[in-house]
From Swiss-Prot:
Protein name: Phosphoglucosamine mutase
Keywords: Isomerase, Magnesium, Metal-binding, Phosphoprotein
Enzyme class: isomerase
Organism, scientific name: Citrobacter koseri (strain ATCC BAA-895 / CDC 4225-83 / SGSC4696)
SUPFAM superfamilies associated with the record: Phosphoglucomutase, C-terminal domain, Phosphoglucomutase, first 3 domains
Sites of Phosphoserine modification: 102
CDD domains with a match to the protein in the record: GlmM (cd05802)
GO BP annotation list: carbohydrate metabolic process; peptidoglycan biosynthetic process; UDP-N-acetylglucosamine biosynthetic process
Similarity field: Belongs to the phosphohexose mutase family.
PTMs per UniProt: Activated by phosphorylation.
Example of a GO cellular component annotation carried by this entry: cytosol
Cofactor, how bound (note): Binds 1 Mg(2+) ion per subunit.
Known cofactor(s): Mg(2+)
Catalytic reaction list: alpha-D-glucosamine 1-phosphate = D-glucosamine 6-phosphate
Amino acid sequence: MSNRKYFGTDGIRGRVGDAPITPDFVLKLGWAAGKVLARHGSRKIIIGKDTRISGYMLESALEAGLAAAGLSASFTGPMPTPAVAYLTRTFRAEAGIVISASHNPFYDNGIKFFSIDGTKLPDEVEEAIEAEMEKEITCVDSSELGKASRIVDAAGRYIEFCKGTFPNELSLNELKIVVDCANGATYHIAPNVLRELGANVIAIGCEPNGVNINEEVGATDVRALQARVIAEKADLGIALDGDGDRVIMVDHEGNKVDGDQIMYIIAREGLRQGQLRGGAVGTLMSNMGLELALKQLGIPFARAKVGDRYVLEKLQEKGWRIGAENSGHVILLDKTTTGDGIVAGLQVLAAMVRNHMSLHDLCSGMKMFPQILVNVRYAAGSGDPLENDNVKAVTAEVEAALGNRGRVLLRKSGTEPLIRVMVEGEDEAQVTEFAHRIADAVKAV
């Protein structure tokens, strides 16, 4: 188990202006990354960002650090995270860097690296970068300094890639779609992908101003999308998050369709088309209704820890191709190397068109179990509530009452002193009562 100082499970992230998301830190990060990556070769680095105002500052700092280490940088401008992974592969770049805090508010930002094959940097490379950051910055000889350039048609290349994941024999001509781009990195891409495939597109969340990313729009807040779908009498809505690696959908009645349901639709269609290899990977938070629906289809299902990184690891371990979190991270390894909201959405649209079915009807084969989540704050020095005898006893009582038609999950937050209590089962009133019973036991510790 590595003991890294800066890199978390999803790169480096924080509030802009507070360590580590400061200009001096990011400059040194660029230099350290440049020193380490230069050992592997002298190819350029691709840098993409979302629409946060801080992206300008941070990409300049990164580029300066890389140049001092002798590596050149190519900027994509605002670009979805999965697009940077794709461009890194196609340009055979030494690495890709994304400046984004995904679904977080504008005042946060982060930095994530992709390796030459469009996957996460190996742990040992991240550790080498951290080790380099302990040293003083040195500059290569002036004749060896890196340069900066801009990739002229980055968006066009990625649009064509996305369209290429949609079956050639199908068209979206019959569909009216509302797409919500979260005022984020997909604002100039997702509407064009859908239009070029023939859809009648109404775009919202496509007016980024640097500070409105994810603000009451996008995959984390679909209320505006739900209202617009109903007002426009659209066939469906598609919501992406700030960096385009998540997708949540809305059916023609305004019902939310989450990552579990999206994976169910894609897995079932893959089975029908004879293209599903193995099973599907969800997380500890995936709805039990997904597990049961896949079981009825004969599709194996495995749960990973929460986090798209762990979903990907489980897929690689099993040799399977499809995984998802209910938050909307959908990973389709036969199409791409990372979660891609646009590509996942297109596979659902293909299932709709091919089967002449609405999104609502495609979801009907999966019954979502009521799932109640209660967050309980505890005193940091009061011991581990999960080891408390009374908490264990109450949890065991609830599990016995639910039997094999429900689940209980207690887990600690990774960032604050919270216990997350999740209970799911067939009866919402019962599940709610059980969740609060366990939460009360945790509070009493």
